[in-house]
């Protein structure tokens, strides 16, 4: 098994970015003739992932992983990757994923390309196009490690339905130590986050105040 995705969830649902990763990972898995495997933490909804092309989901449930902390999450993802001989790990470009990526790269001795915007130009060697300079330019990155990590830029590939028969597997959390303890999390609700929005409208100082927003 060679392709693994990390699926983030919030408020009992998979994030849009998780379903985009499933769509993107499915396309690469089909090119390689391999299975697509997902890892989820404290969230069991395998059928949603199956709808977007995931063949197998590994569900890790543990009270200590209720809130995201980078090192324990990275340790568990690395353990799954090593146990399953993963050669390609795909993450989103969320803040949490960007915390995880360098930790995973060190643990797996992996190459890492962030902000990837489309399917690989080549799989041997792995060659990807990524945005850089705050999306003002693009660069081509060649990853030649045995294990590699892709950070997919949000909303760059989209959601593509590709239903599969899925196998669900429960896994115990790997023993880890952390110096951090999350006591409380406050999040806004009822609105679409900027990361998940299809269209973002931005207004500068020239608008002066909210009374002029109707102009754009």
Q: What kind of region is each of these model predictions?
A:
Residues 1-216:
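N-terminal glycine-rich FAD/FM-binding segment characteristic of electron-transfer flavoproteins
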């Amino acid at each position: 098994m060679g392709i693994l995705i990390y699926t983030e969830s919030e408020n009992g649902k998979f994030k849009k970015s998780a379903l985009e990763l499933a769509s993107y990972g499915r396309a690469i898995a089909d090119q390689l003739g391999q299975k697509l495997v997902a890892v989820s933490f404290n969230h069991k909804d395998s059928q949603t992932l199956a709808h977007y092309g995931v063949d197998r989901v590994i569900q890790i449930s543990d009270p200590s992983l209720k809130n995201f902390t980078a090192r324990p999450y990275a340790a568990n993802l690395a353990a799954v990757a090593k146990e399953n001989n993963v050669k390609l790990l795909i993450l989103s470009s969320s803040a949490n994923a960007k915390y995880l990526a360098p930790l995973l790269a060190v643990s797996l001795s992996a190459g890492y390309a962030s902000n990837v915007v489309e399917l690989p130009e080549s799989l041997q060697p792995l060659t990807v196009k990524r945005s850089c300079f705050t999306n003002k330019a693009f660069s081509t990155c060649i990853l030649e490690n045995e294990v590699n990590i892709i950070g997919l830029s949000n909303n760059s590939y989209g959601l593509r339905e590709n239903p599969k028969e899925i196998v669900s597997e429960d896994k115990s959390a790997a023993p880890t130590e952390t110096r951090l303890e999350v006591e409380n999390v406050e999040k806004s609700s009822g609105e679409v986050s900027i990361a998940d929005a299809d269209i973002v409208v931005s207004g500068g100082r020239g608008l002066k105040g909210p009374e002029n927003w109707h102009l754009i």
